[in-house]
Each structure stands twice: as C-alpha cells, then as structure tokens.
C-alpha cells in the first residue's frame, strides 16, 4: 500500500471492557489533537473499525492511519474490501461481512478520497502514540469514571 504524498499520521485504537461490553475508540494526530468516543455495548473489533472511521471522517487531506488492528489494516492492505464489494458484502466463505454497518462507510470514504493508507503497528510495545490512543480508548469505555 502506497503512502500518499504529504500524508499525516493518525493513530487509532479501540478497546472493550468485556467482549462484548462497554467500548471506547480513539484517534490522535498528536497528544494535543485527538478525539475519543464510547458505545455502551460493543466489541473490540467494532471499536477498532470505529476509531479508523472517525479518524478518516475528521481529518481532511492525505492520511496514513496507523493501527494495531490487523483486522482494520488487512482490510485495505490485502484488499479484502474489494472482494466484499464484488460479492455484495459477503466474505470469501459467502457469509455476511461482520460489522458491515461500520465497514461500509469506512470503505466508501477510503475509496472516495483515494488518499488514505493504512499501516500496522505492534500494540503494547512501547510505541508512544499507540500507547496514547490505547489509553484514550480504554478511558472512553467508561466516560465520566474517575
């Protein structure tokens, strides 16, 4: 996957307390430019996709979405989305794509913009920005908690 010229790096992460359970998502361009959100009942996979979706929605221009989710990164790096579209949102096993309600708008935005790429980063490995968005996503699982 080619990184668009002039791309800004946006780091994303999702978290869930229990799986399913309360979920949180976050994206950050820096430790001062970020957003996070909450879903009362979700899964870790849904929150990972939601983090990427919200990052792409919120940030114009060329983007490199950096995620520790192979689920999110592989969708675009390995072009899973192309097969899903060709098969009418069915997997290669002819089963409905899980989390289509989140994948569909994310895939549409990425295709429409044409200037978004994805990169995997190992989670919980001491990477400053990945650790930062992880902490934001975990905190977002329980908004208002001390």
Which functions belong to the PLM regions below?
Residues 23-29:
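Short beta-strand scaffold segments in enzyme catalytic cores
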Residues 5-9:
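Extreme N-terminal starter segment of soluble prokaryotic enzymes
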């Amino acid at each position: 996957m080619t990184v668009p010229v002039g791309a800004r790096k946006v780091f994303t992460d999702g978290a869930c307390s229990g799986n399913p359970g309360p979920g949180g998502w976050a994206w950050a361009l820096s430790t001062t430019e970020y957003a996070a959100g909450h879903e009362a009942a979700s899964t870790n996979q849904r929150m990972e996709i939601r983090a990427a979706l919200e990052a792409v929605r919120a940030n114009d221009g060329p983007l490199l979405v950096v995620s520790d989710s192979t689920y999110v990164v592989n969708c675009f790096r390995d072009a899973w989305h192309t097969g899903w579209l060709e098969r009418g949102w069915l997997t290669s096993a002819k089963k409905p794509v899980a989390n289509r309600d989140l994948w569909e708008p994310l895939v549409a935005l990425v295709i429409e913009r044409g200037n978004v790429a994805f990169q995997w980063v190992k989670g919980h490995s001491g990477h400053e920005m990945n650790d930062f968005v992880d902490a934001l996503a975990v905190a977002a699982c329980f908004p208002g908690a001390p």
